[in-house]
Amino acid sequence: MGYPEVERREPLPAAAPRERGSQGCGCRGAPARAGEGNSCRLFLGFFGLSLALHLLTLCCYLELRSELRRERGAESRFSGPGTPGTSGTLSSPGGLDPNGPITRHFGQRSPQQQPLEPGETTLPPDSQDGHQMALVNFFIPKEKSYSEEESRRVRRNKRSKSSEGADGPVKNKKKGKKAGPPGPNGPPGPPGPPGPQGPPGIPGIPGIPGTTVMGPPGPPGPPGPQGPPGLQGPSGAADKAGTRENQPAVVHLQGQGSAIQVKNDLSGGVLNDWSRITMNPKVFKLHPRSGELEVLVDGTYFIYSQVEVYYINFTDFASYEVVVDEKPFLQCTRSIETGKTNYNTCYTAGVCLLKARQKIAVKMVHADISINMSKHTTFFGAIRLGEAPAS
């Protein structure tokens, strides 16, 4: 019990059932009984367990080997040339890490300190140590050459560093220590002086010239605030002429009291025996010979007329027209009772848009009629109402 023994793997008892299972179970397509099927599954279970144990042993072996390499490498870096264990061999346990797994295994109690189980015998100490090293060399056959090369490299480094000075060993010891975690970042240093000004850069490519086309006008802005009232201007002189022009212009013509027979006394049937009662000379002009009334100013005019007629056995109705530039504008017709000499009046009126230089007149339609030019019953006139409305 004081030293590790080589594990002796005896043949598993499941080998025999494997043969039996291969012969009796239905692995090759033959029909198998229920008992043979159970033995086949039992064999497969033992086989899987054995394979898992082999894999676990292999993993432990690889872990032990890597741990031993790390310990040997660390010891060869820190130990001197005369220190035991730097020879790179496994001839003595002193070359191993005292805290390593192999050293702990070797440092177990000796057969004198541990109780023996029944049937075990003790070995001498020399034979025990030799047996232990043989086991280690058996498991790790390649560690010997690796350790020897490592020890030679350490000796060469020691010789080269001994000539460097008194600080050499201290630096080697510092280099051999494991580096701790990095500390926190220090505060930033002061800014350095400004560097020299660099050369001027390459001038850029000139931009594309813009167009001279003006864009569409924007929407009108909001109205500004109302300004203060201005100073009162001087009072102007009253324009009497303007006041007169704004007043309505009137013309009124009436008969002179004569009796007229149209067929014998009138030329073209137009009445011309008029007397002026009132007339604005700036707006109207009367032509006495032709009996026409001329308009001098554009505007809207109200035109009216009345004629008194009487019957002399020639016709049974009376009719006349108000013409503008010899074109009929208004017409008035009145029937007369035959066989009597009754007097009858006929009145008409209307509004007309007239332009300057236009002429208006009263024209009789039938020639076989007589007219009484009384100032109270026969008259003709016009009133200017104002400017013509904008079209």
Swiss-Prot record:
UniProt KW Membrane keyword: yes
Residue ranges with Pro residues bias: 181-203, 216-228
Listed GO biological process terms: animal organ development; canonical Wnt signaling pathway; cell differentiation; cell-matrix adhesion; cytokine-mediated signaling pathway; gene expression; hair follicle placode formation; immune response
Gene assigned in the entry: EDA
Purpose of the protein: Cytokine which is involved in epithelial-mesenchymal signaling during morphogenesis of ectodermal organs. Functions as a ligand activating the DEATH-domain containing receptors EDAR and EDA2R. Isoform A1 binds only to the receptor EDAR, while isoform A2 binds exclusively to the receptor EDA2R. May also play a role in cell adhesion. Isoform A1 binds only to the receptor EDAR, while isoform A2 binds exclusively to the receptor EDA2R.
Organism: Bos taurus
Family indicated by similarity: Belongs to the tumor necrosis factor family.
Extracellular side: 63-391
Name of the protein described by the UniProt record: Ectodysplasin-A
Residue ranges of every copy of the THD domain listed in the record: 249-385
Pfam families per record: TNF
Chain positions covered by the region annotation Disordered: 1-28, 73-130, 145-245
Record-annotated Collagen-like domain positions: 180-229
PROSITE patterns to which the protein is assigned, alphabetical: THD_2
Keywords, in A-Z order: Cell membrane, Cleavage on pair of basic residues, Collagen, Cytokine, Developmental protein, Differentiation, Disulfide bond, Glycoprotein, Membrane, Secreted, Signal-anchor, Transmembrane, Transmembrane helix
Organism phylogeny: Eukaryota, Metazoa, Chordata, Craniata, Vertebrata
Disulfide-bonded cysteines: C332-C346
Residues the record marks as site: Cleavage: R159, S160
PTM comment: N-glycosylated.
Secretion signal span: none
Known partners and oligomeric status: Homotrimer. The homotrimers may then dimerize and form higher-order oligomers.
Compositional bias annotation for Low complexity: 76-96
Membrane-traversing stretches: 42-62
GO MF term (any one): tumor necrosis factor receptor binding
Chief place where the protein resides: membrane
